[in-house]
Swiss-Prot record:
Keywords noted in UniProt: Cytoplasm, Methylation, Protein biosynthesis
Role played: Peptide chain release factor 1 directs the termination of translation in response to the peptide chain termination codons UAG and UAA.
UniProt record similarity statement: Belongs to the prokaryotic/mitochondrial release factor family.
Keyword Protein biosynthesis attached: yes
PROSITE patterns the record matches: RF_PROK_I (PS00745)
Any single GO CC term annotated in Swiss-Prot or TrEMBL for this entry: cytoplasm
SUPFAM superfamilies in alphabetical order: Release factor (SSF75620)
Protein name (database record): Peptide chain release factor 1
Phylogenetic classification of the source organism: Bacteria, Pseudomonadati, Pseudomonadota, Betaproteobacteria, Burkholderiales
Length: 360
């Protein structure tokens, strides 16, 4: 293990002891924002320090085995112990290197998932509904909480646009690679000739700001309109102007929320989504230059980029960024995304390791 890496791990060990002390104090929950930051940091570095403790134990075992080699009667045993200790050290060092990769500061945040129907008309809207169900089923498997923020249903079912909030530890780290264009190939229910149609939707996964104040929004830059909420087909669901449309004038970002009968709640939801969209826009602008110099296979989050194809006649899903094809489409659409997400995370980590190697 490199000295620089060991030094970093020693620092984390010291920091974990400090966090344990801070979190054991009686007034630790007096400042909830600070408490969240401390618990988040503790959860992040705890497993790293535990791995490092195992590496140090393996190192101690290696030194003990080396001392035993001098005793002829213990040599065979010592050689076995030495091999085992070095194998453990090598495995743990590789795992620690991955664990020490630069962290996305948004990884542990809650998220907003925005799905928009694209080319394909009604079939695209139906597929948007299928994608929403896929993510909701995945969230259910993770025991995450889901809240509908905004929906624009289509006449035949599905959605022209839908936004949900998913709350759960690590939600962004697991679903951030879903941003982009999703293409579906299947025979629509309305197709009488049995022809396969191709439709598309775009997905945007945005980290939630810890609080709206985290993103600077000047009230003077907002235009807030109220209007009468309506359901699919234009039927009025109430007779008051409870729906809210918030426009951020500098960026042109518009958010509508009408799912609640309370205008106040709709406005609050709209501002949360707006803060997330502005944060997302700032994040992508900040990383645009970096992306131009080092083209990343995944993680660009470009909504115009086609990332995946779902072919129903063949029962397959292909992720074009990593050339992964899985013939388990039914399970995937039911929220079984673990294999896919693990492959995307693994590729992302490999890219980070490669970029660190280039920098050295």
């Amino acid at each position: 293990m490199k000295t620089s890496m060991q030094s970093k791990l020693d620092q984390l060990t010291t920091r974990l002891a400090e966090l344990n002390d801070l979190l054991s104090r009686e007034n630790v929950t007096a400042d909830l924002d600070q408490y969240r930051k401390l618990t988040r940091e503790h959860a992040e570095i705890g497993p790293v320090v535990e791995h490092y403790a195992q590496w140090r134990q393996a190192r101690a075992d290696e030194l003990a085995a080396q001392e035993l080699l001098a005793d002829a009667s213990m040599r065979d045993f010592a050689e076995d112990e030495l091999r085992g200790a070095r194998d453990r050290m090598g495995r743990l060092a590789a795992e620690l290197q991955t664990m020490l990769l630069p962290k996305d500061p948004n990884d542990e945040r809650n998220i907003f998932v925005e799905i928009r129907a694209g080319t394909g008309g009604d079939e695209s809207a139906l597929f948007a509904g299928d994608l929403l169900r896929m993510y909701l089923r995945y969230a259910e498997r993770q025991r995450w909480q889901v809240e509908m923020m905004s929906e624009s249903p289509s006449d035949l079912g599905g959605y022209k646009e839908v936004i949900v909030r998913i709350a759960g530890y690590g939600a962004y780290s697991r679903l951030k690679f879903e941003s982009g264009g999703h293409r579906v190939q299947r025979v629509p229910a309305t197709e009488t000739q049995g022809r396969i149609h191709t439709s598309a939707c775009t997905v945007a996964v945005m980290p939630e700001a810890d609080e709206i104040g985290e993103v600077e929004i000047n009230p003077a830059d907002l235009r807030i309109d109220t209007f009468r909420a309506s359901g699919a087909g234009g039927q009025h669901i109430n007779k008051t102007d409870s729906a809210v449309r918030v426009t951020h004038i500098p960026t042109g970002i518009v958010v509508e929320c009408q799912d609640d009968r309370s205008q106040h709640k709709n406005k609050d939801r709209a501002l949360k989504v707006l803060a997330a969209r502005i944060k997302d826009k700032q994040y992508h602008e900040q990383h645009a230059k970096e992306a131009a110099t080092r083209k990343s296979l995944i993680g660009s989050g470009d909504r115009s980029e086609r990332i995946r194809t779902y072919n129903f006649p063949q029962g397959r899903m292909t992720d074009h960024r990593i050339n992964l094809t899985l013939y388990k489409l039914e399970q995937i659409m039911d929220g079984d995304l673990d294999e896919l997400i693990a492959a995307l995370v693994s590729e992302h980590q490999a890219e980070l390791l490669a970029s660190l190697g280039d920098a050295e």
